[in-house]
Amino acid sequence: MKICWFKDSKIGHEKQVQAILDNLALTQDLVIEERDVSNPVWLELFLYFLRIKPKQDSIPDIIIGAGSATTIPMLRYKTDNKTKVISVMKPQFFESKFDLIVAPRHDYKEVPDNVFTYVGSIARVNINPDLENIGLIVVGGVNKHFDFNDGYLISQIDFVISLFPDINWIVFNSRRTPKGFNEKIKRNTSIRKFIDVHKNFEPLDDYLSKAKLKFVTPDSVNMIFESLSSSGETYLFDMHYSKENKITRLIDEVKSNKYAGFLEEKYLETSEIKTISLNKPNLLHGTFREVEKVVYEIERRFRK
């Protein structure tokens, strides 16, 4: 099977497509051509309306990509009706032109015939029966969905460490994490290792597959579902939001269904004193396998 993969250089997008192709390769012999998207969207639209097709050496069976920058280049590259164009995530333009769109369920109130939905985001399934005594703390940062409160998050981290004092705690930050928070984490002697994206970067994937416990801030949606797709227990920190939207509703769904455990702030009975409590996940849900559902749907629809 010949695959043409359009890439927009965004790690989160490319990891989702890579997970699909890795899973598809378990049952199909794949020949993958990668194409980087470089033109601005307006130029791609201009070329699309002029029906100017890019050069290609062979006709692919599937054209696939994720992210708005890949939408028009993928459609322009299709020259044969036998080629199927798949958008991973809801495209910015021309939804009806795609043979298949695989997108988060929260993006659609009504699902068209050419759309297949999944929960959250797509991630590689990683099953490890030999988990290590490691706890991960994965911190996002300033965002438009949740209030990033340094003090409240630090108090939750201290609470978690006090519950599991024998765990080796490793903290990962992100480019969005405030400097003040980073400085506070560096001073916490209960943390075994602080992996700062700016100074001593290490791949999170190396730890995600072997950590017994994983605590993630709810603004890091892709990371939540990467964690849920790996062995070990996933928990969400408590972050307040002022306005409900599809992301906050998704996080509420994850918590209400107990896909992940979560921290919660409550008042003591008949008191003005607030406490933090830990709610456990329902382990009967098992490891998330959304990528396998997506690949099954691709094979079902486009089986030769």
Model-identified regions with their sequence ranges:
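Nucleotide-activated sugar donor-binding and catalytic core shared by glycosyltransferases
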Residues: 1-304
